[in-house]
Amino acid sequence: MVKNVTVIGGGLAGSEAAWQLAKRGIEVDLYEMRPKKNTPAHETANFAELVCTNSMRSNQLSNAVGLLKEEMRQLDSLIMKAADETAVPAGGALAVDRDKFSAVVTKTLKDLPNVHVHEEEITEIPKDGITIIATGPLTSDTLAEQIKEFCGTDSLHFFDAAAPIVAASSINRDIVYKKSRYDKGEAAYLNCPMTKEEFYNFYKNLVGAETATLHGFEDKNVFEGCMPIEVMAKRGEKTMLFGPLKPVGLEDPKTGKTPYAVVQLRQDNAASTMYNIVGFQTHLKYGEQKRVFSMIPGLENAKFVRYGKMHRNTYIASPEVLNANYEARKQTGLFFAGQMTGVEGYVESAGSGLVAGINAAREALGEETLFFPKSTALGSMANYITTTSAKHFQPMNASYALLPKLDYKVRNKQERHLEISKRALKDLEAFKEEKKLD
């Protein structure tokens, strides 16, 4: 019986998988090529580095990703523990201090006696033993080529982007105001109000701004959930008003009126010295970011701590390659996890690592691998990425659309979602008990 598992990749999925393996007594060899070899998006050597936003989205049980988080908490997720421990104010959402978050994950794993960390690049898929490949959408070229060959299909890709971060001390507090939309949760966001004239001047400059060159980039290959603000703007002058610049529920306390448009800033670290511009993922040249984003009221003298940037993300054709336990169909003992499987988002990525980690541990212990109930967020994601049409396969966030409908009617959408979440948690509890999952 093999009681050793190799995990390749120390991102969110690989870190969660390593934790799930280690807590079940498995000896884990965790390989991470950083800092010896870096990627276009990473900036540190820490595990579970957040390269895009610091938000893990909704924390509400009436939201699919909120349900996913709760399921993961029920299964003793390291990523959720670290996120809850390093949370910063974000209204009804869960946002974290990104540096503290990755530091907690890194220290936890490195302190475990049965997790052996190797700072080196893996260039081939191991043929023997049990392995989890969780190298993420920025997998090194050499290993990516091996994975492509193993899958027997062309790898798919999309382009992802990160939003700029500004120094809190450079924000004009005479203009911005603190408020969460509809006053949900604590007043966690700084809001930059725009008049109609200010909005259209900003819009005109944004669509005319110069973008950086990126090989192979096309607007159609942008993931909808992380679309660059300039791409969104080019879809129509009012598109942003129904997206990140939506003003509803954000009345300006100085005037008592709703602005024409509002740009929100979200706290990026626990010390509240940095804020990111919500929804402003971008591929503009750095000079253009400074010029155009300084037109936002309150950011006229903004100091940019980090400019937005874009990178290419690669993922595999999971419907042709994986079973819903995240194990490869043509090689027993080889699992894939994380964004490269086609789940999209920090929490979703970690969730896939959780399931892959549990299953790799069970295989190492000579137990049957598990297929989580389709009525749970974890099970519905695994089911989607392995059964959907390969021809039209695209990355997917957690969604109620993936979960079975209720067998009774609930008219109110929020209440209906809550009922689906309650059913999911009940089914997960029964599944845990039946399969003796701790």
From Swiss-Prot:
Protein localization: Cytoplasm
A Pfam family assignment: GIDA
Catalysed transformations (reactions): uridine(54) in tRNA + (6R)-5,10-methylene-5,6,7,8-tetrahydrofolate + NADH + H(+) = 5-methyluridine(54) in tRNA + (6S)-5,6,7,8-tetrahydrofolate + NAD(+); uridine(54) in tRNA + (6R)-5,10-methylene-5,6,7,8-tetrahydrofolate + NADPH + H(+) = 5-methyluridine(54) in tRNA + (6S)-5,6,7,8-tetrahydrofolate + NADP(+)
Cofactor(s) this protein requires: FAD
GO MF term list: flavin adenine dinucleotide binding; tRNA (uracil(54)-C5)-methyltransferase activity, 5,10-methylenetetrahydrofolate-dependent
Record keywords: Cytoplasm, FAD, Flavoprotein, Methyltransferase, NAD, NADP, Transferase, tRNA processing
Gene3D superfamilies hit by this protein: FAD/NAD(P)-binding domain
GO BP of this protein: tRNA methylation; tRNA wobble uridine modification
Entry's EC annotation: 2.1.1.74
Ligase found in the keyword field: no
InterPro entries: FAD/NAD-bd_sf, MnmG-rel, MnmG-rel_CS, MnmG_N, TrmFO
Residues reported in the UniProt entry to bind FAD: 9-14
One Gene Ontology CC term in the entry: cytosol
Family: Belongs to the MnmG family. TrmFO subfamily.
Its biological purpose: Catalyzes the folate-dependent formation of 5-methyl-uridine at position 54 (M-5-U54) in all tRNAs.
Name of the protein this chain belongs to: Methylenetetrahydrofolate--tRNA-(uracil-5-)-methyltransferase TrmFO
